[in-house]
Amino acid sequence: MRNTVLTLVLLFVTLASKGQELTLPQLSQYLADNPFVISPTYSGIGDHIKIRINGLTQWVGIKDAPDTQSLAADARVGEKSGIGMLLYNDSNGETKQRGARLSFAHHLTLDRYDDEFMSFGISYNFNQFRIDIENFRDNNDASVTDDRATTNHNFDVGILYRKDKFYLSANASNLLDKDLTKFNPVFEPNRLRNYYIYTGYRYKKSKNSDMEIEPSVFFQYFESDGRSVTDLNVKFRWYDFEDYYYAGINYRFLNDQIGNPLYIAPIFGLKKNNFYFGYSYQVILNEIMGFSTGTHVVTLGVDLFQGLSNCRCMY
């Protein structure tokens, strides 16, 4: 039994390491009304300077499980552009990474009467990745001589199309290959590119309705090992003037195992005045379920008033 537990833990730590390496792990943070974390094209959209702090603790109950903290902020610049910044700290067992992302987006109006817009975004990424061998059990392995660390400079590009309440974004992350001079090129992939597609629609029964339904889909493809995952989401919002409350569900699965979800996550949150709170609890539905109580995702935020743009492409 003990060997089975160790095997399962090692398996999922390995999978998480692949998702973790040189990028911010994408779980359900974007559903906390913060799609900027997955694409630079959302920089500056809205009439506020948006600040979001996120804490993510995976696989509660398993020692050295992944743990992530991030700070994201974006704001409008001029009438048709936006800038953003993302800082993150991520640990998974003996692997650690810290990074920053600086983003710029420009927003164009295709049809101002139909609220049809196109946005283009680019990000510069800085990442420090480290494998710490201090706590390795077998220090006599000749192949393990010291810590392994690398610094990566990279770029993201993205495009966003919006028409009325519909949106569709496509993003390519980490365009440049990784420097393998400090790693074994036989076992270490050098392709870091990830591809994201995010689309959804915000539906109201009538213009004056207090309730809004937002179904959405988030697709990720990892070039390093050919994996791909899909999120199916639905959110319900209830408005009270400029405040709102929401609740929903996030369903994630590997695309070759549609009927076997990785997790199902209830989500809820609220925006009151300029303050924001969001929470998600991911119920793990695979073999690790017997050893973990799940994953917690907490988001706190504040929207600082900036003033409306004269261009509807920024709304």
What is each model feature region?
Residues M1-V5, L110-R112:
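Positively charged n-region of N-terminal signal peptides that target proteins for export
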Residues T4, S17-Q20:
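Acidic, two-metal ion nucleic-acid-processing modules in DNA metabolism proteins
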Residues L8-V9, L180:
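A ubiquitous, low-specificity "background" feature that marks scattered single residues
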Residues V9-K18:
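Hydrophobic h-region of N-terminal signal peptides that target proteins for export
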Residues Q20-Y315:
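Subset of outer-membrane beta-barrel
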